[in-house]
Amino acid sequence: MANNFALREMKLNNGMVDSLNINLLPKEACHDAMMLKTKRMLTASSKRNSATGQKLPFLIRQRKDRIKEMETEFSQSFPPGPPKTQSFFRSSFRNEHFSSASNNDPESFHCAIGPVLVLAQFFGVLPVSGVLRPTPLKMKFVKFSFLTFYAASITATVLVMAILSIIHMIRTLNAKTFAVKGGIAAAMSGAMFYGNCMMGLILFFWLSPRWVTLQRDWRSMEQFIDSNKMQRPKLRWRLYAISSTILFLAVIEHILSIAVNAEKHDYKKGSENATFQDFLQIYCENSHAFILDTVAYNFALGMLIFIVSKLATFTWNFTDVFVMMVATGLAERYKMLNKDVMNSTSKHRNAIDWSGYREDYAALSCMVKKVDSDIAPIILLSFANNLYFICLQLLNGLSKSENSILDNVYFFGSFIFLVGRTVTVTLLTSRINDQSKLVLPALYNCSASTYNVETERLIYLLTTDEIALTGLRFFSITRNFMLANAFTKYTCRWLVQL
């Protein structure tokens, strides 16, 4: 104990910032990460913007928090637990007067995902203003605004379609339905499609005010890690490639769907039936028969069905795209951090800032947990939706005995697109878990001259903290989950055949 108090006194006299104890309780791990890096944040922030004299809110509380930390005893018997999100984000920069040149970084996640979110807002998704502003401090969710009213109107329209679909399902789903080939799919497909899209719009509406806070916390994490002059990930082209590829394939798949449902339309110019009204009626009767069983067809209803189906289709595809982009933003941060650690260990540097690396990994771990708490319902909806519609496509393919060439092209194209989209969202999301463990071999093999107690703490953090996005904690998205998901679909396929 005498040595412990002597060591603590020596650190106090030297004024060291990293005088925190090793035996921090788990609930203090994230706060520990912010405390230890205060000096580095001040230096980097002053270099980026010398004109501002303002500080992050957590720097103002630095002295009081440091005094509380000094009261703990030095001990190695209680290693630190995995970080939690609350302490870290309590000190995030929510001060609206804070400004920094790094806020204008075009490769920040907020700036990279902004244009994609603007496209989504045309379809009533995530009504948050300021998504194209250079800093998330300019973002806000206003309850009474045009964006909110527009999104609520689209959600209400999809809700009406979902109610009509559910009424049809209740009327037609009976014992005879199970005996008819393809009867279950005909009875439930409309209700499941519009019900899924309605839930997606509601969840994005629920996420909107949380998205503002999440983006500010995300930017705080980026500045926290970037203050170490670490290489930043190039996010813009990755997010653009993911969104444009998936949405382009979705457009092709939907065009094939329209062509299949309007196959009986006479496209000859001289024909009496070669009109848009005739095309619209044929399309609605084939694709939305479950609606027309409840409501008589007219041109206005046909236009409503045609427009709402496009809005719902976008939401159906964007749910997966959104999860992919968020997961890519986190995984790329881990990738850059791992690269920097591996470069340091491979060069056998005598002085490696293991404490700084541990703080960065702790901050990133906190960010993953914060993201998971906000988008977990959307992840659950995404995977449940993919599972159902893949099984539905299998059922439709096995039920139809006489198919045209266009039907076969649409079936195989749609099925391949669904499976590919599901595999892609699983692989991209599981990268977070993969990247969080990727640096461990380099830590195990680091030289004895660079290995210290901070290295051990970092190893403990990475091995014990489970870093992954989840579906409301029902499942964690890892590569093993993809195998389990594939086995589930394979089982459903055989059940459908029986």
Per-segment meaning from a language model:
Residues 2-27, 37-43, 47-432, 449, ...:
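Membrane-embedded alpha-helical segments and the immediately adjacent membrane-proximal loops
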